[in-house]
Amino acid sequence: MAVNEFQVESNISPKQLNNQSVSLVIPRLTRDKIHNSMYYKVNLSNESLRGNTMVELLKVMIGAFGTIKGQNGHLHMMVLGGIEFKCILMKLIEIRPNFQQLNFLLNVKNENGFDSKYIIALLLVYARLQYYYLNGNNKNDDDENDLIKLFKVQLYKYSQHYFKLKSFPLQVDCFAHSYNEELCIIHIDELVDWLATQDHIWGIPLGKCQWNKIYNSDEESSSSESESNGDSEDDNDTSSES
């Protein structure tokens, strides 16, 4: 028997959802590429984060994806679907933020010129990828029902917004050696529509999902109106990213 016939993967998170490690929503080959990337090793390893916590990861997220209104481009020129994006998405999956943390980040108010639109996009992709299996059938599970309500409200809310984001084409895997696609500008409602209707994004499979059916529901519309009243200024932020 070959010595290497059975290999234990060292980068599997011990945290679980849906009776398996949270890491397994990302295919093994993609996980290996992410964990072997220089960006992950320098910025997102347990040692570099100085604590494998959401508080430490949030510092990286703000530095990587925070934008300043009135400036062209975001601070470190990261894009949706790129290597750095996938690395942070992977770390977010491994840490598995709780409901209170997700609720806070998805409803944070932009102040002093800071714009969280790339962070919002990251969290929407994370929710669709990590929590695809939620179905709401367990009426006694308040945590599950709270997550479903939060995700549906946020998807519907941003399906009605149109701010621009720099991105790899949604069907393109940045790790593929054969791609010749250039970066593009997408609107947040396009990203939401993709998450609601497609089974993959940037080369990552999206599990079959029930709570992402948002277009025929009045609940999300009424729930999101009160939350989006203070966010209408985002719709005016339609200058192209450079």
Curated annotation (Swiss-Prot):
Keywords: mRNA processing, mRNA splicing, Nucleus, Ribonucleoprotein, Spliceosome. The keyword Nucleus applies. Its main location: nucleus. Present with 2380 molecules/cell in log phase SD medium. Required for pre-mRNA splicing and maintenance of stable U6 small nuclear RNA levels. Implicated in the formation of stable and biologically active snRNP structures. As part of the U4/U6.U5 tri-snRNP particle, dispensible for spliceosome assembly, but required for conformational changes, which result in U4 snRNA release and the subsequent catalytic activation of the spliceosome. Component of the U4/U6-U5 tri-snRNP complex composed of the U4, U6 and U5 snRNAs and at least PRP3, PRP4, PRP6, PRP8, PRP18, PRP31, PRP38, SNU13, SNU23, SNU66, SNU114, SPP381, SMB1, SMD1, SMD2, SMD3, SMX2, SMX3, LSM2, LSM3, LSM4, LSM5, LSM6, LSM7, LSM8, BRR2 and DIB1. Changing C87Y: In PRP83-2; temperature-sensitive; blocks splicing of RPS17A after a 2 hour shift to the restrictive temperature of 37 degrees Celsius; spliceosome assembly arrested at the complex I stage. One of its GO terms (cellular component) is U4/U6 x U5 tri-snRNP complex. Transmembrane segments: none annotated. One of its GO terms (biological process) is mRNA splicing, via spliceosome. It is found in: Nucleus. PANTHER family: PRE-MRNA-SPLICING FACTOR 38A-RELATED (PTHR23142). Belongs to the PRP38 family. This is Pre-mRNA-splicing factor 38. InterPro entries: PRP38 (IPR005037). Residues 217-242 are annotated as: Disordered.
